[in-house]
Amino acid sequence: MAFFLIFLSSFFGLCIFCTALLRWNQVKYNQKNLPPGTMGWPLFGETTEFLKLGPSFMKNQRARYGSFFKSHILGCPTIVSMDSELNRYILVNEAKGLVPGYPQSMIDILGKCNIAAVNGSAHKYMRGALLSLISPTMIRDQLLPKIDEFMRSHLTNWDNKVIDIQEKTNKMAFLSSLKQIAGIESTSLAQEFMSEFFNLVLGTLSLPINLPNTNYHRGFQARKIIVNLLRTLIEERRASKEIQHDMLGYLMNEEATRFKLTDDEMIDLIITILYSGYETVSTTSMMAVKYLHDHPKVLEELRKEHMAIREKKKPEDPIDYNDYRSMRFTRAVILETSRLATIVNGVLRKTTQDMEINGYIIPKGWRIYVYTRELNYDPRLYPDPYSFNPWRWMDKSLEHQNSFLVFGGGTRQCPGKELGVAEISTFLHYFVTKYRWEEIGGDKLMKFPRVEAPNGLRIRVSAH
């Protein structure tokens, strides 16, 4: 009986303590002129609910508090904006104090010189260096031939096999980028890079708690290893004095570029290119295969476009820049895949001073999460929004609407958009002209916080 009374007292005491803690945290952030919303627990806030429920959490909060509300997610107090006009205002006003506000874990692991972490003149310089590597001329003359060569090799010997298309597209996105950046082929060095890189990616999506066995710790350790690998590569190239025709070679060739980067800046830029291209290229490619399987008429139209290109060529001829530019329906498939799968859920900004937005005062240092996911399913923008309909993108103006934020917006719009589209287009070209496929079935897809198949997405491939 005494034990039961002690247990009961402890239980009620814990309930009272938790209630008081929640109340204290709410009062702490109940400042005048802040948007409505809830803040959850101290330190952790509402991160658990956000990551677990994702879109449902956002919809519930919007139903209660409107399209502009406060929360505490990803380790910091955050304002969530789900209003298209406000989103655009936030994205185009970096000069007024709305700078990138990516999680500390991402900044720590991608490096202090990465393009997402720097502002002002430093951002302009680093962005200029990046754009010089992936300009239309570079894509046409240097990168597309490398991509074509890689895709031909990567898609060899898939006939009569069951493959995990998620695993294949993950490797494809990483190894293709590594070939373009540093000329590294499928060697032991590439494998070492890849295993550490996957740890790095998971680390950027975690709370910055540097304890053993946490994703953040593994990601940070992976960064150290990758930095050492890249530093060794730079030193070896500098010692050999041989100019390599890849991105790293271009950055190191002082006569070829006006952007003079330090070794640390080059390393962070390379890691950023690998990171930013990996998630979008791999996941969009996987989901395109999924959607094409589920929509035979779309696949028929896409295959028709690519067979027309192949009919003009010898079997061994690569695709060139003019071929890529002619792939209008392919581009439509990629854009529709990006919209419907929602590879990118939103964009983070941070206030550098107290700011008035939408009639509220947002304190200095708060994050603003421009949550763009719901825009992708707005029937006013996309009739029948949950259907996979690439033909809607044959109207070129749709891609340039202010509401289309899959590739970001403002001065931070994704600089690698065209390179990514070129990679996915080349993959689809060889995949649909060489193979047919059917799903094995039973594989689960998750759409939040990342689009992924936890147990893989298996398909049975046969020659076309």
Curated annotation (Swiss-Prot):
One Gene Ontology term of the biological-process aspect is: brassinosteroid homeostasis
What the entry lists under InterPro entries is as follows:
Cyt_P450, Cyt_P450_CS, Cyt_P450_E_grp-I, Cyt_P450_sf
Q: Which Pfam families match?
A: p450
Q: Where in the cell is it found?
A: Membrane
- What broad class of enzyme is this? oxidoreductase
Keywords, ordered alphabetically: Brassinosteroid biosynthesis, Heme, Iron, Lipid biosynthesis, Lipid metabolism, Membrane, Metal-binding, Monooxygenase, Oxidoreductase, Steroid biosynthesis, Transmembrane, Transmembrane helix
- Mind telling me which PROSITE patterns this protein's record contains? CYTOCHROME_P450
Q: Which Gene Ontology molecular function entries are recorded, alphabetically?
A: heme binding; iron ion binding; monooxygenase activity; oxidoreductase activity, acting on paired donors, with incorporation or reduction of molecular oxygen
Q: What is this protein called?
A: Cytochrome P450 85A1
